[in-house]
Protein backbone atom coordinates (compact mmCIF):
# COMPACT_ATOMS: atom_id res chain seq x y z
CA UNK A 1 0.00 0.00 0.00
CA UNK A 2 1.26 3.46 -0.90
CA UNK A 3 0.93 5.74 2.10
CA UNK A 4 -0.02 9.35 2.64
CA UNK A 5 3.67 10.08 2.26
CA UNK A 6 3.28 9.84 -1.51
CA UNK A 7 0.81 12.70 -1.48
CA UNK A 8 2.61 15.01 0.89
CA UNK A 9 6.30 14.25 0.53
CA UNK A 10 6.80 14.02 -3.20
CA UNK A 11 5.04 17.35 -3.62
CA UNK A 12 7.97 19.21 -2.17
CA UNK A 13 10.02 17.28 0.35
CA UNK A 14 13.30 18.19 -1.29
CA UNK A 15 12.46 21.88 -1.52
CA UNK A 16 14.32 22.43 1.74
CA UNK A 17 17.60 21.24 0.27
CA UNK A 18 17.01 22.60 -3.22
CA UNK A 19 17.10 26.31 -2.38
CA UNK A 20 19.95 28.12 -4.10
CA UNK A 21 22.93 28.95 -1.94
CA UNK A 22 26.16 30.77 -2.59
CA UNK A 23 29.63 30.03 -1.21
CA UNK A 24 30.24 32.16 1.87
CA UNK A 25 33.74 33.18 0.83
CA UNK A 26 35.16 32.06 4.17
CA UNK A 27 38.32 29.97 4.36
CA UNK A 28 37.78 26.21 4.18
CA UNK A 29 37.50 24.33 7.45
CA UNK A 30 40.24 21.69 7.66
CA UNK A 31 38.87 18.53 9.26
CA UNK A 32 40.62 15.20 9.69
CA UNK A 33 38.65 13.85 6.71
CA UNK A 34 39.17 16.75 4.32
CA UNK A 35 38.82 20.50 3.89
CA UNK A 36 35.33 21.84 3.27
CA UNK A 37 33.96 25.20 2.12
CA UNK A 38 30.84 26.74 3.62
CA UNK A 39 27.71 28.03 1.93
CA UNK A 40 25.62 30.93 3.18
CA UNK A 41 22.07 29.78 3.92
CA UNK A 42 18.92 31.70 4.70
CA UNK A 43 18.99 33.39 8.07
CA UNK A 44 22.72 34.19 8.12
CA UNK A 45 23.63 30.56 8.68
CA UNK A 46 26.61 28.65 7.32
CA UNK A 47 26.28 25.11 5.96
CA UNK A 48 28.99 22.61 5.06
CA UNK A 49 27.95 19.69 2.87
CA UNK A 50 29.04 16.15 2.07
CA UNK A 51 31.86 15.65 4.55
CA UNK A 52 32.99 11.99 4.66
CA UNK A 53 33.28 10.44 8.11
CA UNK A 54 34.48 6.94 7.12
CA UNK A 55 35.85 5.09 4.14
CA UNK A 56 33.25 4.01 1.57
CA UNK A 57 31.87 0.62 2.74
CA UNK A 58 32.33 -1.03 -0.64
CA UNK A 59 33.96 -4.27 -1.79
CA UNK A 60 35.69 -5.95 1.12
CA UNK A 61 34.36 -3.24 3.45
CA UNK A 62 30.71 -4.16 2.83
CA UNK A 63 29.20 -5.68 5.99
CA UNK A 64 32.14 -4.55 8.08
CA UNK A 65 32.47 -1.89 10.74
CA UNK A 66 33.17 1.54 9.21
CA UNK A 67 36.87 2.12 8.66
CA UNK A 68 38.46 5.42 9.67
CA UNK A 69 39.30 7.94 6.97
CA UNK A 70 42.13 10.44 7.30
CA UNK A 71 42.52 12.92 4.44
CA UNK A 72 43.34 16.46 5.57
CA UNK A 73 44.85 17.86 2.37
CA UNK A 74 41.86 17.26 0.07
CA UNK A 75 39.42 20.07 -0.72
CA UNK A 76 35.97 18.49 -0.65
CA UNK A 77 33.33 19.42 -3.21
CA UNK A 78 29.61 19.65 -2.59
CA UNK A 79 27.81 16.96 -4.58
CA UNK A 80 25.48 18.02 -7.40
CA UNK A 81 22.80 15.62 -6.16
CA UNK A 82 21.94 14.41 -2.64
CA UNK A 83 24.13 11.54 -1.46
CA UNK A 84 21.82 8.63 -0.70
CA UNK A 85 22.63 5.21 0.73
CA UNK A 86 21.21 2.31 -1.33
CA UNK A 87 17.44 2.03 -0.92
CA UNK A 88 14.30 1.56 -2.94
CA UNK A 89 12.93 4.70 -4.57
CA UNK A 90 10.11 6.04 -2.43
CA UNK A 91 8.46 9.16 -1.12
CA UNK A 92 10.95 9.19 1.77
CA UNK A 93 13.92 9.29 -0.59
CA UNK A 94 12.23 11.94 -2.71
CA UNK A 95 12.39 9.76 -5.82
CA UNK A 96 9.25 8.18 -7.25
CA UNK A 97 9.26 4.67 -8.66
CA UNK A 98 10.28 1.18 -7.61
CA UNK A 99 13.93 1.00 -8.67
CA UNK A 100 16.94 0.86 -6.39
CA UNK A 101 18.71 4.18 -5.97
CA UNK A 102 21.77 5.44 -4.13
CA UNK A 103 25.38 4.42 -3.78
CA UNK A 104 27.29 2.47 -1.15
CA UNK A 105 29.75 5.37 -1.02
CA UNK A 106 27.30 7.28 1.16
CA UNK A 107 28.85 7.82 4.58
CA UNK A 108 28.76 11.61 4.61
CA UNK A 109 27.44 14.29 6.93
CA UNK A 110 26.45 17.96 6.80
CA UNK A 111 27.01 20.70 9.38
CA UNK A 112 24.87 23.80 9.94
CA UNK A 113 25.95 26.61 12.28
CA UNK A 114 25.13 30.27 12.97
CA UNK A 115 27.48 32.64 11.15
CA UNK A 116 29.95 34.35 13.45
CA UNK A 117 28.83 32.45 16.54
CA UNK A 118 30.78 33.17 19.72
CA UNK A 119 32.06 30.37 21.90
CA UNK A 120 31.38 26.63 21.71
CA UNK A 121 27.70 26.01 20.98
CA UNK A 122 25.51 23.02 21.83
CA UNK A 123 25.54 20.39 19.10
CA UNK A 124 22.36 18.69 17.86
CA UNK A 125 23.04 15.47 15.96
CA UNK A 126 20.07 14.46 13.78
CA UNK A 127 19.38 10.82 12.87
CA UNK A 128 16.82 10.58 10.07
CA UNK A 129 13.91 8.16 10.05
CA UNK A 130 12.56 5.91 7.33
CA UNK A 131 12.24 2.48 8.91
CA UNK A 132 16.02 1.97 8.65
CA UNK A 133 15.37 1.20 4.98
CA UNK A 134 15.06 4.69 3.48
CA UNK A 135 15.87 8.35 4.00
CA UNK A 136 18.97 10.52 3.88
CA UNK A 137 20.63 13.57 5.41
CA UNK A 138 19.45 16.09 2.83
CA UNK A 139 15.77 15.66 3.58
CA UNK A 140 15.53 18.29 6.32
CA UNK A 141 16.81 21.85 6.73
CA UNK A 142 17.67 22.85 10.29
CA UNK A 143 19.12 26.27 9.41
CA UNK A 144 16.41 28.17 11.30
CA UNK A 145 16.82 25.95 14.36
CA UNK A 146 20.56 26.65 14.29
CA UNK A 147 20.06 30.40 13.94
CA UNK A 148 17.30 30.94 16.49
CA UNK A 149 18.45 28.45 19.11
CA UNK A 150 22.15 29.18 18.59
CA UNK A 151 23.14 25.56 18.08
CA UNK A 152 25.25 23.59 15.62
CA UNK A 153 23.29 20.88 13.79
CA UNK A 154 24.83 17.77 12.22
CA UNK A 155 22.84 15.55 9.85
CA UNK A 156 24.17 12.19 8.67
CA UNK A 157 23.70 9.21 6.39
CA UNK A 158 24.01 5.62 7.55
CA UNK A 159 23.72 2.25 5.83
CA UNK A 160 20.16 1.01 5.41
CA UNK A 161 18.18 -2.20 4.99
CA UNK A 162 20.17 -5.41 4.46
CA UNK A 163 23.37 -3.41 3.98
CA UNK A 164 22.92 -1.85 7.42
CA UNK A 165 21.59 -4.73 9.55
CA UNK A 166 22.56 -8.24 8.49
CA UNK A 167 23.94 -11.43 9.97
CA UNK A 168 25.14 -14.56 8.21
CA UNK A 169 27.55 -17.34 9.23
CA UNK A 170 29.59 -16.70 6.10
CA UNK A 171 30.39 -13.21 7.37
CA UNK A 172 31.10 -14.23 10.95
CA UNK A 173 34.65 -14.58 12.11
CA UNK A 174 33.89 -16.26 15.42
CA UNK A 175 32.87 -14.68 18.72
CA UNK A 176 32.29 -10.96 18.45
CA UNK A 177 30.88 -10.99 14.94
CA UNK A 178 28.90 -7.81 14.40
CA UNK A 179 25.60 -7.35 12.60
CA UNK A 180 24.51 -3.74 13.26
CA UNK A 181 26.50 -1.91 10.61
CA UNK A 182 24.09 1.02 10.36
CA UNK A 183 24.37 1.56 14.10
CA UNK A 184 28.15 1.51 13.81
CA UNK A 185 27.95 4.15 11.08
CA UNK A 186 26.06 6.44 13.46
CA UNK A 187 28.66 5.79 16.16
CA UNK A 188 31.45 6.56 13.66
CA UNK A 189 29.77 9.86 12.76
CA UNK A 190 29.55 10.73 16.47
CA UNK A 191 33.27 10.00 16.71
CA UNK A 192 33.87 12.45 13.85
CA UNK A 193 31.86 15.05 15.77
CA UNK A 194 34.01 14.56 18.86
CA UNK A 195 37.18 15.14 16.84
CA UNK A 196 36.05 17.96 14.56
CA UNK A 197 32.94 19.83 15.65
CA UNK A 198 34.92 22.46 17.54
CA UNK A 199 36.19 23.69 14.16
CA UNK A 200 32.60 24.68 13.31
CA UNK A 201 31.89 26.39 16.64
CA UNK A 202 30.36 23.35 18.32
CA UNK A 203 30.96 22.01 21.82
CA UNK A 204 32.12 18.39 21.72
CA UNK A 205 31.22 18.12 25.41
CA UNK A 206 27.57 19.00 24.75
CA UNK A 207 26.17 16.79 21.99
CA UNK A 208 22.45 15.97 21.83
CA UNK A 209 21.40 13.08 19.63
CA UNK A 210 17.85 13.39 18.30
CA UNK A 211 15.87 11.50 15.72
CA UNK A 212 12.36 10.58 14.63
CA UNK A 213 10.74 7.19 13.99
CA UNK A 214 13.62 4.85 13.04
CA UNK A 215 15.84 7.77 14.01
CA UNK A 216 14.27 7.77 17.48
CA UNK A 217 14.67 3.99 17.54
CA UNK A 218 18.37 4.49 16.78
CA UNK A 219 18.65 7.09 19.53
CA UNK A 220 17.40 4.50 22.02
CA UNK A 221 19.75 1.94 20.49
CA UNK A 222 22.71 4.19 21.27
CA UNK A 223 21.58 4.36 24.89
CA UNK A 224 21.76 0.56 25.02
CA UNK A 225 25.06 0.15 23.16
CA UNK A 226 28.29 -0.07 25.16
CA UNK A 227 30.17 1.28 22.11
CA UNK A 228 28.62 4.75 22.25
CA UNK A 229 29.90 5.64 25.72
CA UNK A 230 31.06 9.27 25.94
CA UNK A 231 30.04 10.21 22.40
CA UNK A 232 26.90 12.17 23.35
CA UNK A 233 25.48 13.87 26.40
CA UNK A 234 21.73 14.22 25.85
CA UNK A 235 19.15 12.26 23.84
CA UNK A 236 15.73 12.91 22.29
CA UNK A 237 13.64 10.10 20.80
CA UNK A 238 10.70 11.27 18.68
CA UNK A 239 8.22 8.47 17.94
CA UNK A 240 10.90 5.88 18.57
CA UNK A 241 10.46 2.22 19.48
CA UNK A 242 12.33 -0.71 21.01
CA UNK A 243 12.60 -3.95 19.05
CA UNK A 244 15.39 -6.39 18.23
CA UNK A 245 16.12 -9.91 17.04
CA UNK A 246 18.57 -12.53 18.23
CA UNK A 247 21.19 -13.56 15.65
CA UNK A 248 19.38 -16.88 15.37
CA UNK A 249 16.09 -15.15 14.59
CA UNK A 250 17.72 -12.77 12.12
CA UNK A 251 19.34 -15.68 10.28
CA UNK A 252 16.14 -17.77 10.54
CA UNK A 253 17.53 -20.95 9.00
CA UNK A 254 14.85 -22.83 7.06
CA UNK A 255 12.32 -20.36 8.50
CA UNK A 256 12.65 -21.70 12.02
CA UNK A 257 10.71 -18.65 13.21
CA UNK A 258 7.62 -18.48 11.02
CA UNK A 259 6.75 -14.89 11.91
CA UNK A 260 10.20 -13.48 11.05
CA UNK A 261 10.44 -12.26 7.47
CA UNK A 262 13.49 -11.50 5.34
CA UNK A 263 15.82 -13.62 7.44
CA UNK A 264 19.30 -13.85 5.96
CA UNK A 265 18.83 -17.56 5.16
CA UNK A 266 15.83 -16.78 2.96
CA UNK A 267 17.44 -13.63 1.65
CA UNK A 268 20.50 -15.56 0.48
CA UNK A 269 18.25 -18.00 -1.34
CA UNK A 270 16.32 -15.14 -2.91
CA UNK A 271 19.61 -13.82 -4.29
CA UNK A 272 20.00 -17.15 -6.08
CA UNK A 273 22.82 -18.33 -3.83
CA UNK A 274 23.15 -21.66 -2.04
CA UNK A 275 22.28 -20.80 1.54
CA UNK A 276 24.38 -23.71 2.84
CA UNK A 277 27.53 -23.08 0.81
CA UNK A 278 27.56 -19.32 0.21
CA UNK A 279 30.77 -17.50 1.12
CA UNK A 280 31.51 -13.96 2.22
CA UNK A 281 33.06 -13.36 -1.20
CA UNK A 282 29.83 -14.49 -2.87
CA UNK A 283 27.77 -12.08 -0.80
CA UNK A 284 30.12 -9.15 -1.31
CA UNK A 285 30.18 -9.77 -5.05
CA UNK A 286 26.44 -9.13 -5.33
CA UNK A 287 25.42 -5.83 -6.89
CA UNK A 288 24.04 -3.40 -4.30
CA UNK A 289 20.97 -2.66 -6.43
CA UNK A 290 20.19 -6.36 -6.66
CA UNK A 291 20.56 -6.69 -2.89
CA UNK A 292 18.11 -3.84 -2.30
CA UNK A 293 15.50 -4.95 -4.83
CA UNK A 294 15.69 -8.60 -3.77
CA UNK A 295 15.14 -7.51 -0.19
CA UNK A 296 12.08 -5.42 -1.03
CA UNK A 297 10.62 -8.10 -3.27
CA UNK A 298 10.49 -10.52 -0.33
CA UNK A 299 7.28 -10.74 1.73
CA UNK A 300 7.45 -8.85 4.99
CA UNK A 301 5.31 -7.88 7.92
CA UNK A 302 6.81 -6.08 10.89
CA UNK A 303 9.96 -7.93 11.85
CA UNK A 304 12.69 -6.38 9.74
CA UNK A 305 15.07 -4.77 9.34
CA UNK A 306 15.78 -5.29 12.98
CA UNK A 307 18.44 -4.35 15.45
CA UNK A 308 20.32 -7.59 16.12
CA UNK A 309 21.51 -8.59 19.57
CA UNK A 310 25.00 -9.41 18.31
CA UNK A 311 26.70 -9.19 21.71
CA UNK A 312 29.01 -6.42 20.50
CA UNK A 313 27.06 -3.40 19.32
CA UNK A 314 23.92 -4.49 21.17
CA UNK A 315 24.20 -6.72 24.26
CA UNK A 316 23.27 -10.35 23.68
CA UNK A 317 20.53 -10.14 26.32
CA UNK A 318 18.56 -7.91 23.94
CA UNK A 319 17.87 -4.27 23.21
CA UNK A 320 14.95 -3.90 25.64
CA UNK A 321 16.73 -5.70 28.47
CA UNK A 322 19.91 -3.67 27.93
CA UNK A 323 18.01 -0.39 28.33
CA UNK A 324 17.00 -1.49 31.82
CA UNK A 325 20.41 -2.86 32.80
CA UNK A 326 22.65 -0.53 34.88
CA UNK A 327 25.67 -2.25 33.31
CA UNK A 328 25.06 -0.40 30.03
CA UNK A 329 23.49 2.75 31.46
CA UNK A 330 24.70 6.27 30.77
CA UNK A 331 22.92 7.76 33.80
CA UNK A 332 24.31 11.28 33.37
CA UNK A 333 22.53 11.57 29.99
CA UNK A 334 19.15 13.37 30.17
CA UNK A 335 16.59 11.71 27.89
CA UNK A 336 13.37 13.02 26.38
CA UNK A 337 10.95 10.74 24.52
CA UNK A 338 7.60 11.40 22.93
CA UNK A 339 4.95 10.24 20.50
CA UNK A 340 2.28 11.90 18.38
CA UNK A 341 -1.41 11.85 19.17
CA UNK A 342 -2.41 10.42 15.78
CA UNK A 343 0.72 8.53 14.71
CA UNK A 344 -0.78 5.98 12.34
CA UNK A 345 -2.84 8.29 10.14
CA UNK A 346 0.24 8.66 7.95
CA UNK A 347 -0.22 5.03 6.86
CA UNK A 348 -3.96 4.45 6.97
CA UNK A 349 -5.16 7.89 5.87
CA UNK A 350 -5.28 6.90 2.19
CA UNK A 351 -6.10 3.21 2.64
CA UNK A 352 -9.32 2.39 0.81
CA UNK A 353 -10.38 0.20 3.71
CA UNK A 354 -10.80 3.37 5.77
CA UNK A 355 -11.50 6.07 3.18
CA UNK A 356 -13.57 6.70 0.07
CA UNK A 357 -12.27 8.51 -2.98
CA UNK A 358 -14.30 10.59 -5.43
CA UNK A 359 -13.03 12.27 -8.57
CA UNK A 360 -15.19 15.40 -9.02
CA UNK A 361 -12.99 16.80 -11.77
CA UNK A 362 -10.80 14.17 -13.41
CA UNK A 363 -8.90 11.05 -12.43
CA UNK A 364 -5.75 12.82 -13.57
CA UNK A 365 -5.98 14.95 -10.42
CA UNK A 366 -5.87 13.77 -6.80
CA UNK A 367 -9.20 12.43 -5.52
CA UNK A 368 -11.47 13.93 -2.92
CA UNK A 369 -10.91 11.83 0.20
CA UNK A 370 -13.45 11.22 2.96
CA UNK A 371 -13.62 8.80 5.87
CA UNK A 372 -15.96 5.84 5.50
CA UNK A 373 -16.63 5.54 9.23
CA UNK A 374 -15.18 8.51 11.13
CA UNK A 375 -15.96 7.05 14.56
CA UNK A 376 -14.28 3.72 13.81
CA UNK A 377 -11.31 5.49 12.19
CA UNK A 378 -10.78 7.72 15.21
CA UNK A 379 -11.01 4.73 17.55
CA UNK A 380 -8.45 2.77 15.52
CA UNK A 381 -6.07 5.73 15.38
CA UNK A 382 -6.46 6.40 19.10
CA UNK A 383 -5.67 2.84 20.19
CA UNK A 384 -2.72 2.40 17.84
CA UNK A 385 -1.28 5.79 18.78
CA UNK A 386 -1.69 5.04 22.48
CA UNK A 387 0.10 1.78 21.76
CA UNK A 388 2.97 3.75 20.25
CA UNK A 389 3.20 5.86 23.39
CA UNK A 390 3.19 2.72 25.53
CA UNK A 391 5.97 1.01 23.58
CA UNK A 392 7.96 4.05 22.46
CA UNK A 393 7.71 6.35 25.47
CA UNK A 394 6.50 4.80 28.72
CA UNK A 395 8.25 1.45 28.39
CA UNK A 396 11.73 2.75 27.45
CA UNK A 397 11.63 5.62 29.96
CA UNK A 398 10.61 3.25 32.74
CA UNK A 399 13.45 0.93 31.73
CA UNK A 400 15.94 3.80 31.75
CA UNK A 401 14.78 4.87 35.19
CA UNK A 402 15.35 1.36 36.52
CA UNK A 403 18.86 1.47 35.01
CA UNK A 404 19.69 4.61 36.98
CA UNK A 405 18.82 7.51 34.69
CA UNK A 406 17.67 10.56 36.68
CA UNK A 407 16.65 13.22 34.13
CA UNK A 408 13.80 11.86 32.02
CA UNK A 409 11.11 13.83 30.19
CA UNK A 410 8.13 12.85 28.05
CA UNK A 411 5.76 14.59 25.66
CA UNK A 412 2.80 13.97 23.39
CA UNK A 413 2.48 16.10 20.25
CA UNK A 414 -1.18 17.04 19.65
CA UNK A 415 -1.21 19.94 17.15
CA UNK A 416 -3.79 19.41 14.39
CA UNK A 417 -4.79 22.90 13.27
CA UNK A 418 -4.25 22.21 9.60
CA UNK A 419 -6.22 24.10 6.97
CA UNK A 420 -8.71 21.86 5.22
CA UNK A 421 -8.94 21.81 1.42
CA UNK A 422 -11.63 20.87 -1.07
CA UNK A 423 -9.93 17.49 -1.56
CA UNK A 424 -9.16 16.45 1.99
CA UNK A 425 -9.84 17.52 5.57
CA UNK A 426 -6.25 17.35 6.76
CA UNK A 427 -7.19 17.89 10.40
CA UNK A 428 -9.59 14.93 10.29
CA UNK A 429 -7.67 12.47 8.11
CA UNK A 430 -4.12 13.37 9.16
CA UNK A 431 -4.05 15.49 12.32
CA UNK A 432 -1.06 15.04 14.63
CA UNK A 433 0.41 12.36 12.39
CA UNK A 434 3.70 10.53 12.49
CA UNK A 435 6.57 12.90 11.62
CA UNK A 436 4.35 15.97 11.42
CA UNK A 437 6.13 17.59 14.37
CA UNK A 438 9.45 17.83 12.54
CA UNK A 439 8.49 20.94 10.57
CA UNK A 440 7.99 22.82 13.83
CA UNK A 441 11.34 21.69 15.21
CA UNK A 442 13.21 22.76 12.09
CA UNK A 443 11.09 25.92 11.92
CA UNK A 444 10.31 25.41 8.26
CA UNK A 445 7.13 24.07 6.71
CA UNK A 446 7.58 21.16 4.33
CA UNK A 447 5.40 19.46 1.74
CA UNK A 448 5.66 21.97 -1.10
CA UNK A 449 2.30 22.94 -2.69
CA UNK A 450 0.23 21.56 0.18
CA UNK A 451 2.49 23.00 2.88
CA UNK A 452 0.11 25.95 3.19
CA UNK A 453 -2.60 23.48 4.24
CA UNK A 454 -0.42 21.31 6.45
CA UNK A 455 1.20 24.29 8.17
CA UNK A 456 -0.90 27.38 7.41
CA UNK A 457 0.39 30.87 8.10
CA UNK A 458 -1.58 31.23 11.30
CA UNK A 459 -1.00 32.35 14.85
CA UNK A 460 -1.51 28.74 15.94
CA UNK A 461 1.28 27.42 13.71
CA UNK A 462 3.64 30.24 14.71
CA UNK A 463 2.95 29.53 18.37
CA UNK A 464 3.66 25.82 17.84
CA UNK A 465 6.96 26.60 16.12
CA UNK A 466 8.01 28.72 19.08
CA UNK A 467 7.01 26.01 21.57
CA UNK A 468 8.82 23.18 19.79
CA UNK A 469 12.00 25.02 18.84
CA UNK A 470 12.34 26.52 22.31
CA UNK A 471 11.86 23.19 24.08
CA UNK A 472 14.35 21.35 21.85
CA UNK A 473 16.87 24.20 22.11
CA UNK A 474 16.52 24.34 25.90
CA UNK A 475 17.05 20.60 26.14
CA UNK A 476 20.22 20.80 24.04
CA UNK A 477 21.59 23.57 26.24
CA UNK A 478 20.57 22.39 29.70
CA UNK A 479 19.21 18.85 29.57
CA UNK A 480 15.67 20.00 30.40
CA UNK A 481 13.00 21.30 27.99
CA UNK A 482 11.95 24.10 30.33
CA UNK A 483 8.49 25.52 30.85
CA UNK A 484 5.97 25.72 28.01
CA UNK A 485 4.41 29.18 27.94
CA UNK A 486 4.81 29.41 31.71
CA UNK A 487 3.67 25.85 32.45
CA UNK A 488 6.30 23.79 34.26
CA UNK A 489 7.39 20.58 32.52
CA UNK A 490 7.90 18.05 35.30
CA UNK A 491 10.26 15.09 34.80
CA UNK A 492 9.03 11.57 34.13
CA UNK A 493 9.15 8.67 36.57
CA UNK A 494 7.32 5.38 36.91
CA UNK A 495 5.47 6.69 39.96
CA UNK A 496 4.71 10.05 38.34
CA UNK A 497 4.67 9.51 34.56
CA UNK A 498 4.46 13.18 33.63
CA UNK A 499 4.30 14.16 30.00
CA UNK A 500 3.69 17.51 28.35
CA UNK A 501 0.91 17.70 25.80
CA UNK A 502 2.46 19.91 23.13
CA UNK A 503 -0.19 22.05 21.50
CA UNK A 504 -0.65 25.71 20.65
CA UNK A 505 -2.83 28.61 21.75
CA UNK A 506 -2.94 27.62 25.39
CA UNK A 507 -3.97 24.01 24.78
CA UNK A 508 -0.72 22.57 26.17
CA UNK A 509 -1.01 20.71 29.45
CA UNK A 510 1.03 18.58 31.83
CA UNK A 511 -0.48 15.16 32.43
CA UNK A 512 0.60 12.10 34.41
CA UNK A 513 -0.74 8.83 33.04
CA UNK A 514 1.18 5.99 31.44
CA UNK A 515 -0.07 4.05 28.44
CA UNK A 516 -0.23 0.29 28.89
CA UNK A 517 -0.68 -2.25 26.11
CA UNK A 518 -2.82 -4.57 28.24
CA UNK A 519 -5.18 -1.72 29.12
CA UNK A 520 -5.40 -0.70 25.47
CA UNK A 521 -6.19 -4.29 24.47
CA UNK A 522 -8.92 -4.34 27.10
CA UNK A 523 -10.40 -1.21 25.55
CA UNK A 524 -10.44 -2.92 22.16
CA UNK A 525 -12.13 -5.97 23.68
CA UNK A 526 -14.93 -3.78 25.05
CA UNK A 527 -15.49 -1.81 21.84
CA UNK A 528 -18.55 -2.30 19.64
CA UNK A 529 -17.15 -0.16 16.80
CA UNK A 530 -15.23 -2.98 15.12
CA UNK A 531 -16.28 -6.15 13.36
CA UNK A 532 -14.69 -9.50 14.23
CA UNK A 533 -11.81 -9.33 11.76
CA UNK A 534 -11.06 -5.70 12.62
CA UNK A 535 -10.85 -6.62 16.30
CA UNK A 536 -8.29 -9.32 15.52
CA UNK A 537 -6.23 -7.10 13.23
CA UNK A 538 -6.08 -4.32 15.81
CA UNK A 539 -5.26 -6.77 18.62
CA UNK A 540 -2.48 -8.25 16.47
CA UNK A 541 -0.98 -4.86 15.67
CA UNK A 542 -1.04 -3.79 19.31
CA UNK A 543 0.59 -7.07 20.38
CA UNK A 544 3.30 -7.30 17.73
CA UNK A 545 4.13 -3.84 16.38
CA UNK A 546 6.85 -1.52 17.71
CA UNK A 547 8.00 -3.59 20.68
CA UNK A 548 9.32 -7.13 20.69
CA UNK A 549 6.35 -9.12 19.32
CA UNK A 550 4.17 -10.69 22.01
CA UNK A 551 2.55 -13.48 20.02
CA UNK A 552 1.33 -15.17 23.18
CA UNK A 553 -0.49 -12.00 24.21
CA UNK A 554 -2.33 -12.02 20.90
CA UNK A 555 -3.19 -15.71 21.20
CA UNK A 556 -4.63 -15.24 24.69
CA UNK A 557 -6.36 -11.91 24.05
CA UNK A 558 -9.98 -11.75 25.15
CA UNK A 559 -10.15 -15.43 26.05
CA UNK A 560 -8.50 -16.56 22.83
CA UNK A 561 -10.99 -14.78 20.57
CA UNK A 562 -8.45 -14.50 17.74
CA UNK A 563 -6.27 -17.53 18.46
CA UNK A 564 -7.27 -19.16 15.18
CA UNK A 565 -7.15 -15.98 13.08
CA UNK A 566 -4.06 -15.59 10.90
CA UNK A 567 -3.92 -11.81 10.69
CA UNK A 568 -1.09 -11.77 8.17
CA UNK A 569 -3.20 -13.85 5.78
CA UNK A 570 -6.29 -11.79 6.59
CA UNK A 571 -4.60 -8.51 5.78
CA UNK A 572 -3.33 -9.96 2.52
CA UNK A 573 -6.86 -11.03 1.61
CA UNK A 574 -8.21 -7.55 2.35
CA UNK A 575 -5.45 -5.90 0.33
CA UNK A 576 -6.00 -8.19 -2.65
CA UNK A 577 -9.75 -7.57 -2.50
CA UNK A 578 -9.21 -3.81 -2.59
CA UNK A 579 -6.73 -4.16 -5.43
CA UNK A 580 -9.18 -6.26 -7.40
CA UNK A 581 -11.97 -3.72 -6.93
CA UNK A 582 -10.02 -0.49 -7.30
CA UNK A 583 -6.68 -1.47 -8.86
CA UNK A 584 -4.84 -0.45 -5.70
CA UNK A 585 -5.42 -0.49 -1.95
CA UNK A 586 -4.57 3.21 -1.84
CA UNK A 587 -6.76 6.03 -3.10
CA UNK A 588 -3.80 7.23 -5.18
Regions found by a protein language model. Give the residues of each.
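Alpha/beta-hydrolase active-site loop
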Residues: 106, 176-198, 256-265
